[in-house]
Each structure stands twice: as structure tokens, then as C-alpha cells.
């Protein structure tokens, strides 16, 4: 018997003092639903004792507090926080998020395997446990230009890395159902691991075929009816509440104790400003309980059910033998983390300071050609023009059709109906593609907003009222090596540089948060009415989410999975 195992047993039995003992509080038993008054003994990374009195080398008074298992975000793109994995760690771990299951899909689309390796290297050094799903759809579709291509042979060398769980969200659901050979090769290679799903509005027998391929989770449900069908068919539903995609309210009816073993929580895409102002999974928990969800249901979804869905069998309960990922909160309802333990370590500034840094990658990833105002013109169309219809708080965009006014021999914007221009410019140095269109719902009355964050291939996406400002915004992105830019009347009125693959900042998250606040104000000054104009801009080029999108190759009818202009 190893000395380490003997030590765990001795401290659990009480033969010797535990390394840490939480004294005087109660813990939330997610099996029985009870609040149990008890000391909690910890040895190294593991809980070794509950339901009794213990002595510890270090004793922490948690009188009047409640101890709950650490929270698990089951699907997110860390890149959407606009900070590096190290800064994300420092940003959300103090809120109680002790494990995240991330898909480095964004950086993989820009840098390929170099981006995945960067995330794996970072995950080995962070305090929180970052688990990585291997990006399954790079490029996401044939309807856009990506900076990389990841066939199955480039993914399999990573599959046995200690931080890898399996295959990330399989977005090309038409490819699965229609037996695309490239899709099937990836699915076949990961049949013995976890395969994450992505199946918005997929129902009936097509859903059956998708699930028959071994896919087990979905974070794209936007209605309780859709979620229930998927639960009936064996899926774990990851209830999402991000900065743009907000599905928690719609899925409240399924957040019950009965269904909680088949539910988990995720954020998908959440920026540091929202994290600072509202929180992360802790905010989801507060929101759900205030709306009438039973605490047992939502806390299960935040921990034990999430862990089981992804095969993380060592965490999710406050019980002997389980990983000491613990959050000490003031109350179940408020869910305010007062102390966090990650693998038995107190989360402090000193703990973060002791991490080994990881060198950033992709610092010269923006290779777009310089554009001119004339590049944004579209020939006048006397008939109806397809227009992307933005829905606040949703990444689904409607396919709308309008007769638009003429500006000389070009089609013009229609501010009375909130219709402005949108364009996508290829920025990986592959082909120089440039596609133009129209979008409704941003509220802009002047100026332009541009971004190198444009799911999923992360080409440049720009919306604007006049061509000169659009051109300036796009060209400025090249100068700052990626990020967000706001322009009005020929002047840059706001910007944030994201030089790591054009997706993430090298600055501390506090500075990113503050800069993003000023950037949002600059967008509002143009008339923007969306709560998250930059993240909604970033989803306009996403051709795997219905109904009409725009890529560097043109307008995409997602329902028919084809280019239409």
C-alpha cells in the first residue's frame, strides 16, 4: 500500500490531523438534498471526512456558511472571454467555477494544431481544472474560409493527453445525418470517448440518426419542448446562459429535481464585462432559484450531473474520496462565493502568482488585404434583397426580404427600418475574399463596428452605415493585430486589441473589462441598441446556426446549407 493512500485513510479515520478542516458550517448533500452540519476534512487534493468532528493542521471557520461542490462549466469557448486561459482562470475561479470543459474551436480555426497545443499547455498550468475537447469541425463548413484544416489525423495525436476528454461539439449535423465521409471518420475515431453535440432545432428521425453516431450532449436547446425530446432520447442537456445566447429562462420548466441528473450548465460565450457585473455559473444559480427552481435541481446541474455527463467521476459531491473542489457560500439562494478550494488548495492571489506562464501564439494572424470604401458597394437590386434579421439575445438570425432604396447605381441602407450594411473579409491570407450584404436589428444610425472575432472561421466582420467608416474600421484591425474597432465620421472612437490569434488580449482581465465597457459606450453612441453588439456581430458569419448568415464567400442559407449570393 502506498504511503499516500495510507495517509488518506489515516486522516479520514481521524488517526492523524487532516491537512485542512472546514469547521462549523453545513454542506449541501446533492444526493439527499439535506443541509448537513459537519466538519469537512481534506487531505491533499481529496475530501477524506464528513459527518463528524475532525482536527486539522489548518482549520478554517465556516460557521454560518454552506459548503457546496465546485461548479463545472460544461461547454465554453475561453476565447470569447477575450482573455488568455491564465487570465480566465484568475477571473472565474474565485466565483466557484473549479472545472471547465472548453472547446478551443476559435483559436483552432485560426491556428490549427498550434492553437490546440497552446490551450493544452495552458491547461497544465492553471489552478482551475481546464479540460479540453478536440475541435471537431475545423473548418466548420465548406461555406467559409478558415485559417486551418483539422482532419481526423491531426486530432488523434492529442486524444490521450491528460487534459483531453474527447471530441468537441459536432456542429456539422447535416454532415452526420447525410454520412459525409470526413464527419464519419472523426466520429469513428472517437467512439470510445465523449462526443459533444451541437444540434439546434434538430428533431425527429434526423435527431435519432445524429445520436446513433455516439453523440451524447447538446447546448443548443432554445425551448423546453426541444430539450425534453432530446432528454427522452438519452441526451444530457447543457443549459446555456452566455452573453448572447440566453436560454436559461426558456429552459426553466425542465430544471426539476426529477430531470436534474440529465442536466448541466454552460456559458458557451461570456465576456469579462458580464462576468464582472453579473457573474458566471453562480449568476445562473441565483437567477434560477429566484425564479422558483429548487436549489437541489440547479446545484446538481452545476456539479454532480455535469461531472457524470463528461466522465469526471472524481468530483461533484461533498463526500469522502471525492476531489476537494469546494465553494463556501453565504447561502444557497445568493450563491456568493466567500472562499474557494481547488483540489484542496485555497484560491488566493498568491496561488495564481505561482503559475508558470505560457508563451502566447498567433501574434501575426491578421493578414487581410487593405480595403477601400468602394469595396462595400452592392449593385442596385430592384427586387427584394435578402437581409439578416438579428434577434436580441439570440444567435439565430432570420432570413428577411426587403426592397431597399437606391444610392446611385448601388443598393443603399434603410435607417428607418434599421437596415445597414454588413461585410465579411477573409483575414487568414488564403484568398482575399470579400462578401457584402445587409443586416437588420443593430440600431446603428451612423459609423461602423468591425471585429476579427467572427465565428467560426474568425474572418473580419463589419457592420456600418457608410462605406468610408467601414473601410477605416477594417483597416484599423490590421494595424492593431485584431480586436474590435468602432469608427464614427472618419475617426476611431473605440478599440480593443486582441493580438493572440485576433481573439484574445494580453492584458489582465480587469483592463479588458474596463476597455470593453468604454468600447460598448462607443457603440451605443452610434445608436446600437443590442445589449451585446460585439458578440452579436461575431455570430453573423456563423453558418451552422439558422437561418441566414454571411461568410467571406457570400450569403448562406443555413436551412438549405448553401450559398445564395
Curated annotation (Swiss-Prot):
SUPFAM superfamilies: Composite domain of metallo-dependent hydrolases, Metallo-dependent hydrolases. Keywords: Hydrolase, Manganese. It comes from the Bacteria. It is an enzyme of class 3 (hydrolase). Its cofactor is Mn(2+). GO terms for biological process: adenine catabolic process. It holds the Pfam family Amidohydro_1. It catalyses: adenine + H2O + H(+) = hypoxanthine + NH4(+). GO terms for molecular function: adenine deaminase activity. InterPro entries: Adenine_deam, Adenine_deam_C, Amidohydro-rel, Metal-dep_hydrolase_composite, Metal_Hydrolase. Transmembrane segments: none annotated. Its EC number is 3.5.4.2. Belongs to the metallo-dependent hydrolases superfamily. Adenine deaminase family. HAMAP family: Adenine_deamin. This is Adenine deaminase 1.
